[in-house]
Amino acid sequence: MKKPSLIFLTGFSTSGKSTIGPLLANSLGFEFIDIDKEIVDREQKSINEIFAEKGEPYFRELEYNVLSSISQSEDLVVALGGGTLENDKCFEFIRKAGTLVYLKSDVATLARRLSHKEDRPLMKGENGEKLSIEDISDRVEKLLAKREPRYSAAEILALTDKTPLGVTIENLTRQIERHIRANCKTN
C-alpha cells in the first residue's frame, strides 16, 4: 500500500539529495536514510569498489534490497542514488510504496558541482583521468536525457540550482505536508 509519508528523493548526482535529505527529514520530524550510505555500510566497501568488483547489476540489486527492507516504514525520507530509478524493479517499487520528489538542477550546475567531486565515477575518463568541465557536461546531458522520464514521474518537483537551501527546505516541507494531508483524506 502506498504510504504518502515515505518520501523518496531522486535526482542526478549532486542535485542535493544527501544534503537536502537530512534537513528535510528534520523539518518534517521524520527519520532519514541515504541508500548509497546504507549500501556502503552493509557491504563495507565504497560504491566505486562495489561497481569495480561486482558490477552495476549487483549494485542495483543491493539498492532494491535496501528499498525492500524499508517498505513498511512511514515518516521517512530516503535519498536514492542518482541512477536508482533506472532499475525497473526499484522504479515500480518506489511508485507503489511512497511519494517521489525530484530535485532538479540544470546541466551546467550539475557539471560544475561534479567537477569538485573526486569520488564520482562520472568524473573519470576511461583510463581514470579527470575529465574537463566540457566532457562532464556532455556526460551529464546524455545521462540526464536518459533518466529524465523516470525523474519526471515524481509527484513533487524542487529546483535546486538557484534556490537557497533554506528556501528549498521550507518549500519542500510545505509541499510534502500538503501532499500527505491530501492523500490521507483519499485513503
Swiss-Prot record:
The enzyme's E.C. designation: 2.7.1.71
Principal location listed in the UniProt entry: cytoplasm
Co-factor(s): Mg(2+)
Record-level GO cellular component terms: cytosol
Localization, UniProt: Cytoplasm
Top enzyme category: transferase
Residues noted as binding Mg(2+) in the record, renumbered to the chain: S18
Reaction catalysed by this enzyme: shikimate + ATP = 3-phosphoshikimate + ADP + H(+)
CDD domains in the cross-refs: SK
Cofactor, free-text remark: Binds 1 Mg(2+) ion per subunit.
GO MF, one example: shikimate kinase activity
GO biological process: amino acid biosynthetic process; aromatic amino acid family biosynthetic process; chorismate biosynthetic process
Residues that hold ATP according to the record: T14, S15, G16, K17, S18, T19, R120
Binding-site residues for substrate, renumbered to this chain: D36, R60, G82, R147
Keyword Amino-acid biosynthesis: yes
UniProt KW keywords: Amino-acid biosynthesis, Aromatic amino acid biosynthesis, ATP-binding, Cytoplasm, Kinase, Magnesium, Metal-binding, Nucleotide-binding, Transferase
Superkingdom of this protein's organism: Bacteria
UniProt pathway: Metabolic intermediate biosynthesis; chorismate biosynthesis; chorismate from D-erythrose 4-phosphate and phosphoenolpyruvate: step 5/7
Function noted in UniProt: Catalyzes the specific phosphorylation of the 3-hydroxyl group of shikimic acid using ATP as a cosubstrate.
Family (UniProt): Belongs to the shikimate kinase family.
Oligomeric form and interacting partners: Monomer.
The protein's name: Shikimate kinase
The encoding gene: aroK
